[in-house]
Amino acid sequence: DENYVGEAGHRTFVIATGKIAFVLLLGLFLPLFLSLGLVRDETERGTLHYLLSKPIHRGEFIFYRVLGYLAVVSVFVLILSLVMALITSVIGPGDSFVRLGDFPVWLGIAFTTILVLAAYGSLFNTIGLLLPKYGVYLCIIIGVWEFAMGFTTLISPGSSVASLSVSHWGLQLIDSVVLAS
């Protein structure tokens, strides 16, 4: 019974950290701060028309900016997930020094977080391009909505309102990853 309680507590910690810290917090705040202004610097400095006068299509320019954003946040999330996997595998209950069973769960959490970052990043970047002055306010409203829907999913996973949210599907993906591993 004591082993079961230790394992249940450890699993709960891993799942809660993955859901709240990775999908809800990192998944919302990284795109809000990084992808919303991917093209804003060039627009404010007045150098955007110089970049767009080069023989590269406007869509490609934005696409490469989004790919750069995804590369940076993906590497960050993967490194952070591997560090968390190492920490939780060392402090978790078990007979061996390192629990290798935690690594697939954390890699699944990283993959889910990267998908959420891609969805929010492309949404926030699009809003930032379409509404350069007021896009940040709309993105904050969307972020508050998504955060509320994420907590609604944590409290009531079967809620039909929360199924309209990216964070809901990210949290459901983490549940699937945990069940599969």
Feature-to-residue mapping (PLM):
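Secretory targeting signals
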Residues: 1-37, 62-134, 172, 178
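Terminal transmembrane helical anchor/hairpin motif
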Residues: 2-14, 130, 135, 139-181
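Hydrophobic alpha-helical transmembrane segments
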Residues: 12-19, 51-62, 85, 142-152
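Helix-loop-helix units of permease transmembrane domains in multi-pass membrane transporters
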Residues: 37-71
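Perimembrane helix-loop junctions in membrane proteins
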Residues: 41, 45, 88, 92-96, ...
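Amphipathic alpha-helical recognition patches that constitute DNA-binding helices
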Residues: 47, 122, 126, 139
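Flexible domain-boundary/linker segments
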Residues: 56, 65-68, 73, 78, ...
